[in-house]
């Protein structure tokens, strides 16, 4: 199928997970979501990734984000591997891992890239908004573990810009100044941005983070 693009509706599915069967859209409810795939259970990089996700539970909860992982391994394999993750990463996995043995979800989300590996999922990441639309996609090669601090940073930006007429500049972190979007006129700025602003160029106007 065609690759999913930003703004597309995240396809719904039902699947067996380590926490029972889920209907993806119902499971998300009105929260933000991250769906990410890993190549295989009992592999080193994936073990560190899922351990990190578990350690970041409080950070995801603060942002109202639900997380689900996926590979083409079965749920029984996931349960065995979770014991290793908990032991080696000093954590407790507390999110569902989807068993996608029939590759239904992997194909729905274009997570298998034949020129990389014809059988296993790549390291895909999908951030999904409360409207069930895709807000971010990132694909990593099997050799590179994901940076979950960066994913939190992007979620901070997505949630900020969903409710305020700003964008976030390069290397922005929560608390840094933001860019006022071009659609905002200078006349609107005092009402929308009472903290003030600095005009560097007519198209480049900065303001303290509004939230």
Where are these regions (language model features)?
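Chalcogenol-based redox active-site neighborhoods
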Residues: 1-211
């Amino acid at each position: 199928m065609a690759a999913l693009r930003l703004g597309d509706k995240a396809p719904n599915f039902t699947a067996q997970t380590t926490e029972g069967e889920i209907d993806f859209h119902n499971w998300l409810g009105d929260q933000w979501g991250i769906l990410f795939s890993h190549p295989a259970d009992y592999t080193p990089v994936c073990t560190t990734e899922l351990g990190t996700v578990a350690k970041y539970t409080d950070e995801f909860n603060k942002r109202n984000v639900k997380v689900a992982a996926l590979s083409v391994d079965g749920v029984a394999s996931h349960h065995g591997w979770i014991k290793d993750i908990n032991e080696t990463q000093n954590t407790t996995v507390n999110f569902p891992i989807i068993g996608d043995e029939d590759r239904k979800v992997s194909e729905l989300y274009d997570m298998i890239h034949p020129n990389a590996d014809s059988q296993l999922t790549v390291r895909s990441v999908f951030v999904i908004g409360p409207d069930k639309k895709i807000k971010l996609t990132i694909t990593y090669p099997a050799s590179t573990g994901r940076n979950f601090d960066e994913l939190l940073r992007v979620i901070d930006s997505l949630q900020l810009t969903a409710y305020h007429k700003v964008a976030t500049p390069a290397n922005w972190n929560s608390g840094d100044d933001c860019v006022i979007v071009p659609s905002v006129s200078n006349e609107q700025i005092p009402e929308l941005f009472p903290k003030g602003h600095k005009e560097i160029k007519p198209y480049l106007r900065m303001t303290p983070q509004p939230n």
